[in-house]
């Protein structure tokens, strides 16, 4: 169940309402304060545990600062890189796309929403973005193969993609893993600032 940005004070009455009609509820996701409070209230009704698991943080670009890398340049993905992008998606976030990785990569090509950082003719990193909706575009996914990490490529490419979003008259946002201090630090250097934390709470 997704509670979104529900005000924490409303979490209790919402949990009260669902406890009697949806006893099989296995989890809740949304704003951290609301989801955690919902979980505690659910425990009071149904017993069991309410365990906070995956946490993400929403960031908004407020003051843009460009980042650069020691080598390479950004460009859009090409049709010859559909399998490459699909393979990187498999390696970087295997649970999110399942068997639809190639179709997803083809869609990025069609929408021109996947960027590649290239060094000496070799693709070393990818950063995507969403088609703007209501003036907002979300940056991601971001993936660098292990052998090309710690060289500033992801930060530089994220910076370039973010700049393009802003140049198009849209706002840029992105999500990060709460436990990934490195990426949170890099995005802060670009000018992203936290807006809200979201978590999954497993009920059982």
Language-model features, listed with the residues they occupy:
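Acyl-donor-binding surface of acyltransferase catalytic domains
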Residues: 1-71, 201
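A conserved beta-strand-loop-helix scaffold within acyl/acetyltransferase catalytic domains
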Residues: 97-143
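Conserved acetyl-CoA-binding loop-helix of GNAT-fold acetyltransferases
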Residues: 8-17, 140, 144-146, 150-167, ...
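Conserved acetyl-CoA-binding loop of GNAT-fold acetyltransferases
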Residues: 44-50, 188-197
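Recognition helices and adjacent regulatory flanks at domain boundaries
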Residues: 116-118, 129-132, 151-164, 171, ...
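Conserved GNAT acetyl-CoA-binding A-motif
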Residues: 22-32, 165-176
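Conserved beta-strand-loop-alpha-helix junction that forms the acyl-donor binding cleft
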Residues: 29-35, 174-184, 201-204
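Short amphipathic alpha-helix that is part of the acyltransferase structural core
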Residues: 64-97
């Amino acid at each position: 169940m997704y509670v979104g940005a529900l005000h924490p004070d409303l979490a209790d009455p919402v949990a009260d309402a669902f406890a009697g009609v949806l006893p099989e509820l296995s989890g809740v996701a949304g704003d951290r304060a609301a989801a955690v409070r919902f979980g505690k209230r659910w425990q009071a009704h149904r017993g069991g545990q309410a365990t906070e698991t995956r946490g993400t943080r929403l960031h908004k670009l407020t003051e843009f600062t460009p980042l650069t890398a020691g080598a390479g340049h950004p460009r859009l993905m090409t049709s010859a890189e559909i399998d490459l992008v699909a393979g990187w998606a498999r390696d970087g976030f295997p649970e999110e796309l399942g068997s639809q990785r190639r179709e997803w990569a083809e869609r990025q090509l069609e929408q021109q929403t996947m960027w590649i950082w290239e060094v000496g003719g070799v693709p070393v990193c990818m950063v995507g973005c969403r088609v703007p909706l209501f003036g907002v575009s979300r940056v991601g996914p971001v993936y660098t193969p292990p052998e090309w990490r710690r060289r500033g490529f992801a930060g530089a490419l994220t910076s370039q993609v973010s700049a393009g979003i802003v140049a198009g008259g849209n706002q840029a946002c992105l999500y990060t893993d709460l436990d990934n201090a490195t990426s949170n630090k890099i995005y802060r250097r670009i000018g992203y600032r936290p807006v809200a934390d979201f978590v999954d709470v497993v009920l059982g």
